[in-house]
Amino acid sequence: DWDSIDARIQRIFDHGGTFEGRMKKYLEKADLYIDDEVSVKNENPPISGRIDFIIKHDKHTDALLELKTIKNEDFHDLKEAPKHEHMIQLQIYLNLTDRDYGVVMYENKNDQNLKAFKVDRDEKVWHDILKRCEKIMTMTTEPETCTGMWYCKCKNRRKE
């Protein structure tokens, strides 16, 4: 529920939304835009998400484009590849839509500079994602600590 999300987190998501709006205009102007906010879903294991953009690509019929806004320090730390969790997200989308190629594009929140990293579909990574989902879904005991990201709701959960 949107109202239960911390106001600061809501502002972070809103900032990302303005990036998507601007990018849509740029993609349309460059005649690269095909579609946006495309929902994808896998039944088993249950995985769902929303692809930011599907764009035209000169070497592929089309490509997936995921947009991320990122703070200055993290932006400068990105050298060779996208953040692992963003690569995983794009791998899921590539595999669920049977596409071979995508891009994660970052916008620096401080100065709007951009960095983009290509991601090729990787069957091994997809297999590992499915194995991890299966492992989590079949756990019989709760983990002692949460290993999720800082925003994971499990971080604040206390064992009773």
Where are these regions (language model features)?
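Metal-dependent nuclease catalytic cores that hydrolyze phosphodiester bonds in DNA/RNA
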Residues: 1-64, 70-77, 84
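Extended aliphatic helical segments
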Residues: 5-12, 34, 38-40, 88, ...
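Short amphipathic alpha-helical face segments that pack within enzyme cores
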Residues: 18, 22, 88-92, 96
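Short, small-residue-rich loop/turn micro-motifs
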Residues: 68-69, 108
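Metal-dependent nuclease catalytic regions and adjoining charged, substrate-binding loops involved
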Residues: 77-83, 92, 96-160
